[in-house]
């Protein structure tokens, strides 16, 4: 609702035909989470767009500039004279110039969308591009300096509110996980076997990572709770982790992509979060497969087409019509706060195991 108010107000202020709030995911793909437009225009709300539509170099430029204006997507770019800076002997740096022309490929992309002018407001969090407010007009449209500065200010203020809301949600969840972690440490300290402390009480190991299954593989025994792969599959998985993972934490929401044998137990473990207690001992959390239907703005597998006119070259796709993809072999993604909680638990387990070993010595 808040994001919808944002795009409505930006459209009221700027007069553009379409205004979208576009959010990036961890893979660089983006989705339209709010939209305000002319009734006659095709809706993009809820559609996903592949990373190749706004590739890494373009995202880097957006992260360096709060505002990007293209008043006429059909204009002829003007050559910079001289092309090489006579002092630095390098091409003139235009990253922060409002007059910097867009790449020919981007102009073609806008033409294919029926866009005559665009204004883009960057939403930047921790010096990284979180998303964009994208304004499109069907005909050329100039935006004055005063209005551009107003949009820049609006973008900063709006994203400050978005970031604050996200942090409030994260804080509540962090506090919940901190309580679970504290309880687990207390339970482990009270039990003769730390494994009992992780699974025999409430809250238990599952609550630390919002998992549907978990396993504590210690020595030659795997103790499980919830929905997990069978013992034989667990043993092979632990062996694979020993041979292939050196990090303090390993996590994936598509285990079958890196460990093909996981496809046979995808219904319980398409997602894996794993922490090593030692070279041979692991704590594992599992999430089941969640089959999703993703709505794309055009086929993401054909983001670029080959054009043989004037030589062979890549050009943007011409269709942005709804293209549905069914995504399988994936779970809900692990949140960073859950991964950090698992790492904190790892430290606590190591300390308790060492202390218990000293007491037995």
In which residue ranges do the predicted regions lie?
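A conserved hydrophobic secondary-structure block that centers on an alpha-helix together
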Residues: 1-28, 116, 126
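Signal-transducing coiled-coil/dimerization helices and immediately adjacent hinge/linker segments
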Residues: 2-8, 163-229, 326-361
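GAF sensory/regulatory domain recognition
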Residues: 22-84, 217-243, 247-257
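Flexible loop/coil segments at beta-strand boundaries within sensory signal-transduction domains
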Residues: 27-28, 124-129, 138, 275-281, ...
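Signal-transducing coupling segments at domain and membrane junctions
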Residues: 76-115, 254-272, 291-306
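Regulatory loop-to-helix N-cap segments in sensory/regulatory domains
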Residues: 97-101, 136-152, 165, 284-286, ...
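Short hydrophobic beta-strand micro-motif common in sensory/regulatory domains
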Residues: 116-124, 270-276
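Allosteric cytosolic regulatory segments
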Residues: 152-159, 343-347
């Amino acid at each position: 609702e808040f994001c919808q108010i944002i795009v409505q107000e930006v459209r009221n202020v700027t007069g553009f035909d379409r205004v979208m709030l576009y959010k990036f995911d961890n893979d660089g793909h983006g989705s339209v989470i709010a939209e305000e437009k002319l009734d006659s225009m095709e809706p993009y709300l809820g559609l996903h767009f592949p990373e190749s539509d706004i590739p890494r170099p373009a995202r880097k430029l957006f992260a360096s500039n709060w505002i990007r204006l293209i008043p006429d997507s059909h204009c002829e770019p003007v050559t910079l004279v001289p092309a090489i800076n006579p002092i630095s002997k390098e091409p003139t740096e235009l990253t922060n110039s409002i007059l910097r022309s867009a790449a020919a490929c981007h102009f073609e992309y806008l033409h294919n969308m029926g866009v005559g002018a665009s204004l883009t407001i960057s939403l930047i969090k921790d010096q990284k591009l979180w998303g964009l407010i994208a304004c499109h007009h069907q005909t050329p449209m100039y935006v004055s300096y005063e209005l551009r500065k107003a949009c820049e200010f609006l973008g900063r203020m709006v994203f400050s509110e978005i970031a604050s809301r996200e942090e409030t949600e994260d804080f509540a969840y962090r506090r919940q996980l901190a309580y679970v972690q504290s309880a687990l440490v207390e339970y482990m300290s009270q039990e003769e076997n730390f494994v009992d402390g992780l699974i025999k009480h409430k809250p238990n190991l599952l609550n630390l990572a919002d998992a549907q299954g978990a396993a504590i593989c210690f020595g030659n025994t795997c103790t499980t709770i919830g929905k997990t792969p069978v013992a034989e599959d667990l043993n092979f998985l632990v062996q694979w982790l020993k041979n292939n993972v050196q990090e303090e934490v390993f996590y994936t929401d598509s285990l079958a992509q890196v460990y093909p044998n996981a496809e046979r137990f995808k219904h319980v473990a398409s997602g894996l979060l794993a922490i090593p207690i030692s070279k041979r001992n692991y704590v594992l959390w599992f999430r089941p497969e969640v089959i999703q239907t993703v709505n794309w703005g055009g086929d993401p597998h054909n983001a670029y087409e080959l054009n043989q006119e004037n030589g062979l070259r890549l050009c943007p796709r011409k269709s942005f019509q709804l293209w549905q993809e069914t995504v399988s072999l994936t779970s809900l993604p692990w949140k960073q706060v859950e991964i950090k909680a698992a790492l904190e638990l790892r430290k606590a387990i190591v300390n308790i195991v060492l202390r218990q070993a000293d007491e037995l010595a």
